[in-house]
Swiss-Prot record:
One of its GO terms (molecular function) is structural constituent of ribosome. The keyword rRNA-binding applies. One of its GO terms (cellular component) is ribosome. It comes from Cytophaga hutchinsonii (strain ATCC 33406 / DSM 1761 / CIP 103989 / NBRC 15051 / NCIMB 9469 / D465). This is Large ribosomal subunit protein uL24. Part of the 50S ribosomal subunit. Belongs to the universal ribosomal protein uL24 family. Pfam families: KOW (PF00467), ribosomal_L24 (PF17136).
Length: 111
């Protein structure tokens, strides 16, 4: 049952994140892209899979390529800009009345 309501995610493109569960636990990386519909993100250097490509006109020899696969955002936490540890985030208004994200542990504004 699809909903028209837009989902609010704690992860955005360009964020530094830490993996909290799975094979890549405790590894960190930068978010390359986010799929809001499926709640997945592609993180640099995380969840590497091996793809076997058939020879085509563009790639005459084919070959084996390692690339990042999407990972569910529930397995990711934002890295605190101050300490580098995993932290939850909150939202608050800054001096100009604009909503900003901040790290709950240190109070540091994210991005």
């Amino acid at each position: 049952m699809a909903s028209n309501k837009q989902t609010k995610l704690h992860v955005r493109t360009g964020d530094n994140v830490i993996v909290i569960s799975g094979d890549d636990k405790r590894k960190s990386g930068k978010v390359l892209s986010v799929d809001k519909e499926n709640q997945k993100a592609i993180v640099e250097g995380i969840n590497i899979v091996t793809k076997h490509n058939k020879p085509t006109a563009n790639v005459p020899n084919g070959g084996i390529v390692k690339k990042e696969a999407p990972i569910h955002i529930s397995k990711l936490m934002i890295a605190d800009p101050k300490t580098g540890k995993a932290t939850r985030i909150g939202r608050k208004e800054d001096k100009n009345g604009k909503m900003v994200r901040y790290a709950k542990q240190s109070g540091e504004v994210i991005k």
